[in-house]
């Protein structure tokens, strides 16, 4: 049988954790090859010593089939798992083009609701799945990725509730590598459910320049949050995500459970003057609203203000 080639593009916390478990599981399997695409000092360390993966179940040193910044060394991929930041998606797609063949599946695992559509536009005719993950993992230093928190969910599927043999087979490949993977027929519901929290809270912690907890202690801030979530419900359901209005209470409950002073990654990036995911987490809602003919006045106001920063 032909070898199955799984390529992990982006070896930060998310890519490093899932890629590391895949490399660990299939190191001695002659039929499955695992490739890491990374760059810089991190790549050099992995090429020299392998990837060190620190998890709640122990610390492992894993070695992929190949770690490289030159995808032409890989050949045509069967599965490509992409984990860049949303603002790097277009350049990352351009990077992987040489390894995309007629039967390649591309699976983005990054924040946002428009990633798969963006990839399909850039790679016409390619089978693009959809996914999202719940995980706390980070790149500690070059060559070392650490996960914490005990949650590592890897959710994926194909749009319009499609099922095929490859989806089922891929779920098995992941589970055999001790990855908490679930194939969902209605993956849109899963992705949108996560997006309700990350989009609204990232946008508003940045807009108001406050912590998660402070979003709920002021009536104006809380009302703005509810308004954004109401706009999202209309858009998500127009897209077929089947979201109930109870999502508003769920987001508020999630915020209440978090330490008061914690904040979103996007807010931290704004404060540090770094590139942010404001388009993927805020602007994409405005664009989708325009496309669907659904007004998003709260999102539009927040997005326009954030663009000035």
Predicted regions: what is each one?
Residues 100, 146-155, 206-215, 263-272:
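Helix-loop-beta segment of a Rossmann-like dinucleotide-binding subdomain
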Residues 60-144:
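Rossmann-like NAD(P)(H) cofactor-binding subdomain of soluble oxidoreductases
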Residues 188-216, 220-233, 259-260:
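Active-site-proximal catalytic alpha-helix in oxidoreductases
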Residues 1-59:
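NAD(P)+-binding Rossmann beta1-loop-alpha1 motif at the extreme N-terminus of oxidoreductases
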Residues 75, 111-190:
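Rossmann-fold dinucleotide-binding core
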Residues 20, 24, 28, 94-98, ...:
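Short, well-ordered alpha-helices that flank and scaffold nucleotide-derived cofactor binding pockets
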Residues 2-4, 31, 175-176, 226-309:
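NAD(P)-dependent Rossmann-like dehydrogenase/reductase catalytic/cofactor-binding core
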């Amino acid at each position: 049988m032909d070898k199955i080639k799984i390529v992990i593009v982006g070896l930060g916390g998310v890519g490093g954790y899932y890629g590391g478990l895949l490399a660990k599981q299939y190191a001695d399997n002659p039929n499955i090859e695992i490739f890491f695409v990374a760059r810089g000092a991190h790549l050099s360390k992995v090429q020299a010593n392998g990837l060190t993966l620190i998890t709640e179940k122990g610390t492992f040193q894993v070695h992929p089939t190949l770690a490289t910044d030159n995808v032409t060394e890989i050949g045509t991929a069967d599965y490509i798992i992409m984990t860049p930041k949303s603002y790097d998606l277009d350049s990352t797609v351009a990077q992987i083009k040489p390894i995309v063949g007629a039967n390649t599946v591309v699976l983005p695992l990054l924040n946002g609701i428009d990633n798969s559509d963006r990839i399909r536009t850039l790679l016409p005719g390619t089978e693009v799945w959809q996914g999202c993950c719940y995980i706390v993992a980070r790149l500690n230093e070059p060559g070392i990725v650490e996960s914490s928190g005990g949650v590592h969910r890897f959710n994926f599927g194909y749009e319009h509730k499609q099922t095929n043999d490859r989806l089922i087979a891929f779920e098995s490949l992941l589970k055999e590598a001790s990855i908490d993977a679930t194939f969902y027929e209605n993956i849109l519901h899963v992705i949108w459910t996560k997006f309700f929290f990350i989009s609204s809270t990232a946008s508003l912690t940045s807009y108001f320049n406050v912590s998660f907890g402070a979003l709920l202690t002021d009536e104006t801030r809380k009302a703005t949050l509810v308004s954004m979530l109401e706009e999202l419900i209309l858009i998500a359901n127009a897209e077929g995500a089947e979201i109930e209005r109870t999502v508003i209470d769920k987001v508020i409950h999630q915020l209440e459970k978090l330490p008061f002073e914690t904040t979103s990654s996007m807010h931290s990036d704004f404060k540090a003057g770094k590139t942010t995911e404001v388009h993927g987490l805020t602007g994409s809602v405005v664009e989708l609203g325009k496309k669907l003919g659904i007004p998003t006045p709260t999102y539009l106001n927040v997005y326009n203000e954030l663009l000035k920063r």
